[in-house]
Amino acid sequence: MVRGSPNPGHFGLPVRLKKTRQAAGYSRLALSLRAGCSDATVGYLEGGQRWSSLGTVARFASALGCSAVWLAYGLGTPEEAGAVDIAGLGLRLASVRAERGLTKADLVEATGLSSAAILGIERGAEARVDTVERIAKALGVSPGWLGYGIGPMVLPPHRRTRSAPATASP
């Protein structure tokens, strides 16, 4: 029996990052140098101690030659690397919010974020992967599309099927 809600996609980011880094043959230090960040950032993210910004995840994905959407949220495949549009996050957020007829206050209530956070993102501030996923869930859109401008705007619903019960042969 399935209970509760599935974990957010960004929960798998630490494992995806570590496995992809190791498969590429990079140490934490080597990846940090390729991505232009500190090796502590790689360690914190792989350890699940911090959630990174969309930009940092995009730099890791570029350095590893994989998809930023896959690395951040587990959507698509690792090989689907493409140009990301982080700068368009605010515009995508504002347009979907307006299309859904939601005020900033409605979105604040639905996400638990502050109004300053929502306003900041709509005005171009960078956001963390966990924040974008919370907003995407509240708006009913794909976090990959909202954060990076990649993939379908709305994900197809996940359907879990039960296997038929085994029957005894006569």
Q: Can you name each region flagged by the protein language model?
A:
Residues 1-23, 77-99:
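A short, Lys/Arg-rich alpha-helix, primarily the initiator
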